[in-house]
């Protein structure tokens, strides 16, 4: 899951620039995604996730670590899926009238997992079902909110995020 955990913080660090929705509004008059989802953030986040995934692949191959075997496809799907999940959550938040940065417990913690899992199930189901066993799923569900909160607090302290959630 590391390739899925990396893209969001990297997107926050190097985001900015042109919003993915080009500042357009949806039929309800609200922004489609908002200013927080930019092409620079998307590209940097996905590249960082893929890069960390490639490092994992190299480490497992070189040092024979007992970690799930990743592929270039799996790390790409995990990284891209994480950010697509975040964008999907932002779309729904806007429809519900929630503002950028407004806390949305549970959805804020698991959007990346849902996006990464869905994209991987669609495009690489054999890898997904071989790797994401019940114990792995439980570990992901337990670790993700703790990791999410910790990274957001750090982002708040270093002034990358305006809110610590």
Swiss-Prot record:
Per the entry, which co-factors are needed?
Mg(2+)
Transmembrane helix among keywords: yes
Q: Which reaction does it catalyse?
A: 2,3-bis-O-(geranylgeranyl)-sn-glycerol 1-phosphate + CTP + H(+) = CDP-2,3-bis-O-(geranylgeranyl)-sn-glycerol + diphosphate
Where the protein is mainly located, per its record? membrane
- List the gene name: carS
Extract the InterPro entries matched here.
CarS, CarS_archaea
Which EC number(s) does UniProt give?
2.7.7.67
- Offer an example of a GO molecular function term for this protein: CDP-2,3-bis-(O-geranylgeranyl)-sn-glycerol synthase activity
User: What's this chain's function?
Assistant: Catalyzes the formation of CDP-2,3-bis-(O-geranylgeranyl)-sn-glycerol (CDP-archaeol) from 2,3-bis-(O-geranylgeranyl)-sn-glycerol 1-phosphate (DGGGP) and CTP. This reaction is the third ether-bond-formation step in the biosynthesis of archaeal membrane lipids.
Q: Which named protein is this? A: CDP-archaeol synthase
GO biological process terms, semicolon-separated: glycerophospholipid biosynthetic process
* Membrane topology, as annotated: Multi-pass membrane protein
Task: Mark the transmembrane ranges.
Answer: 41-61, 72-92, 103-123, 127-147
Q: Pathway listed for it? A: Membrane lipid metabolism; glycerophospholipid metabolism
Q: Which GO terms describe its cellular component?
A: plasma membrane
User: NCBIfam families under this entry?
Assistant: PRK04032.1
Family note = Belongs to the CDP-archaeol synthase family.
Give the keywords, sorted. Cell membrane, Lipid biosynthesis, Lipid metabolism, Magnesium, Membrane, Phospholipid biosynthesis, Phospholipid metabolism, Transferase, Transmembrane, Transmembrane helix
Asked if the record carries the keyword Chloroplast, the reply is no
Quote the Pfam families the UniProt record gives.
Answer: CarS-like (PF01864)
Where does this protein reside within or beyond the cell? Answer: Cell membrane
